Amino acid sequence: MLNALQRPQHREWLLEQAEALLEFARKARQPLGFAYLDKNGEPDFGQPIQAWISCRMTHIYSIGALMGMEGCREMAEHGIRSLLDSFQDPQHGGFFEAINHQPDAAGHAVPTPEGERKTAYAHAFVLLAASSGLIAGIERADELFNAISGVIDRHFWEEGAGKMRESFSRDFGECEAYRGVNANMHSVEACLAAFDAQLSLGVAANDERAARWLARANSILGFVLDLAGRHDYRIPEHFDAHWQVLWDYNENDKTHQFRPYGATVGHALEWARLACHALAMNQKYGVDAGEHYARDAYGLFRQSLGNWHGDGAAGFVYTTDFQGVPIVRERMHWVLCESIGAAVALDGVNAADAPVGDLGLAEAYVATGLGGEFSYWYEQFIAYADRYLIEAPGRWHHQLDTENLPAEGIWAGKPDIYHAFQALMLPLLPFGPFITRAVKISSAVD
């Protein structure tokens, strides 16, 4: 166990901060979904209602429902309804990426011109929302799960490649000639959630209804972790339709929110966490995959630490080149959140008799071993969040400048609570199950 978690006051602080996030985000609820929030936690009506935000909120409030938090079940039910009734395309199937706040004269949701495209990123989050809804027993979550499963099977999952296609035109007639690691990363998370959702319904782990989701997660993970290992644990993120690296992709748009140029530090940390979760599931259910996941997760974690204070200021830079030189030096809250999750997950792997092995520990940690290392970094990351990111309970700055002052540019406002909430909850939960199922079976939040 991480040293900090042996202190009751720290566990209480984590839970109080998580509950404050659930309270802060309540104003996001709008008739057709969940709105993007501004820096004061008010709906930003200059932004459309976006699927990824509505899905993340549905996922988080499903967890809140399992925690017994007042009003969270109603929020999750609203999210499931909005995804089915507002975001689902009644003409071509699939789910819109973004819709207008105002419906048409007949009361139907209207996609924005850009938001009518069908993207793997948005569909991964629909699967996440449906899975958490199933685990939490949210009304109509089964309907949403069946709908999104069918769309992924028919259009997004590319069996020969063992990964997700990126995006399609509204009618699924045109497939984008690009493949991306970001959408596939969130697809891994969603597949792990879907696997656990099936288990929560009593489906056996080796039943195809459950097993296919874990197999898909392992397929994507195997590719990305092998790729990372061959590039000094800095992950190329952009590919053509044949999965050949596009090294110069977005060289002229280095601060892109979802497809930035270079290596994204926070994604390395997120992949490390997901690899640990998949490893635990594989081991528990006898799946012959992922024998190198612990090694690669640790490699990603250690390489990312080279960017901690990497430009002389506290915190993680956003992106680097493939030699580790910072490109975009602004600090994103989600990167720090994923560093917390990675430290927690690696500690869980190490404590579960699946040690990451002799991987060249920093000399300072030899005396205490890996557990000491993860405890040290966990406390460093929590201290940074408390000092720089948490404006007040429930209010996390989403972007800081190079001097760690609140800033905007890449991200404006405080759009959602997904990364911060998970970072606060993961330390409190048993390691192994996906976060929503872990809450369901845990007494840590009672």
Regions found by a protein language model. Give the residues of each.
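Glycan-recognition and catalytic cores of secretory/periplasmic carbohydrate-active enzymes
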Residues: M1-D446
